[in-house]
Amino acid sequence: MGFFSRGLLFISLAINTYLDGLRSFGYHVFNLSLHILNSILVFYIFQKVLVQFRNQIQTSKNDVSISFIAASIFLIHPIQTESVIYIITRSEILASTFYLCGFLIFQNFLELKIPKRLLKKTFLFLSIIFFAVVGFSVKQTLATFPLILFLYYIATCPLDSFTIKLLYKWRKHLIIVISVFLTLLFYKLLNDETFLIGPSNPDEMVGRAKYMLSQPSVIIFYYLKKILFPINLNIDPDIEVVTHIFSFGFISGIGSIVFMIYYFLKQGEWRFYLFFLAWFFIILSPSSSIVTLHDLAAEHRIYLALPGVIFIVSYGIFCFLKNLTYIKIINMLGLKILVSFQIILLFGILTIERNKVWRTELSLWKDSYKKSPEKIRPLINLARAHSIDGKQEVAIRYYEKSLLKAPGVFVPNYNLGELYLKDNRMEDAIIRFKTALQLNPNIPETYSKLGEIYLEQKNWKLADFYFKKCIEIDNRFPQVFKNLGILHFYHLKNLKESLLYFSKSLALDPKQKDASEISKLISKYQRGKLNLPSQKGP
């Protein structure tokens, strides 16, 4: 695995593992610390925004309250729970740290206009490249970073600047080139499933065309709705798949996006609004267009896109409050404090409630199954959570229910086979494990389980067959080698072969149970004092 295949992410997880083992506390502290840091970065970024957009917006450049509201919303918004609590979604938080650091440095870079500060500008420029490259090693979201920087530069340039005049002069040519490029790109994406990312698995994904057609409605009617009204959050939402371009979901999603762009274009602060709207859409674009993912929607994907909406909302709140003070309803400072307190209190309560849902695996999947009763994954994971909680009968019931909905899924077949095996329902377990083998013949544990069952049933030949199939796929199972040793030593009477299996088992796990007995057997054989027994072994 290369450094740019999320190398830095796995390094951070490895450090946590080295320090804390598998105890989750250290992982959560790391994630939470990064999230707090990102909130501070959001505050300072918006402070810079107020300065660099000062000629376009209706506020003082020193108005800390707007930045405070924005950073507070980012910090305590309930939709951030999945990104912060779910350990593996550290990729979102860590990549965002580098993204936001690089963006803040770029804002400082734009303020250095004196030629004498060339050395400092060079240092800042190299720092931006560093954060972009290192951030890309965490998550490929950083691929959008150069475009965001370019758009910010354009948005903050005076209308009479050379850059704006040049773009205006060549606007028709640029529109044609961009339109042709996007048309060809989307045509290729929709007609070639393998373009850029390789083929998707049709059993696990909806396919790129349907995925892309579904995303406009996902962005508007799920992501944006959950940002503005963060209730009924769900780790596994049930999203309707859009199958054709003339469907209501696609047309309404695209129509809403076009309306927002048109509405903001009519505002006096249109460049401010359009930039942060672009921030939201562009950062979402990798997971909402080119890259076909297993889930149509996931709340952690909007972690870094969230500031785009937050900045617009925070500034909108400010403008609304300013208009109220014009009619002498209440003084501006008091109104800001009141609204800020209400937002923090409301989002804080909702976040606490959402954290309660994430407290255990069982509570999380109970919540998801309640909200997505037609989806198969919440049902399977709820069954697994009950199994971990020691409620085997409840787990069996949910797994059996999942197989009625989706009999062709590997996981419930295998897990149900394990539960049947624990419950001594051997024939039922065999059926489930053999079904699992048909669905995925490359899982060594399935062969191992069947070998154990046939060993228990004294069907030596089948036990031997399945154990050997297991180690053909993966030869790192000490228990399977031990079982083969027992089988060949005590039942099939193959002395040399059995000792080879025992030796391999001992080499893989020298501290296993019965290790001393196995060592004695090998030692006796080496001294020539070992005879094949007639009874069952260790």
Give residue spans per PLM region.
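Polytopic membrane enzymes that build or remodel cell-surface glycoconjugates and lipids
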Residues: M1-L419, R432, E445, K449, ...
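C-terminal luminal/periplasmic domains and tails of membrane-associated envelope-modifying transferases
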Residues: I330, L362-P538
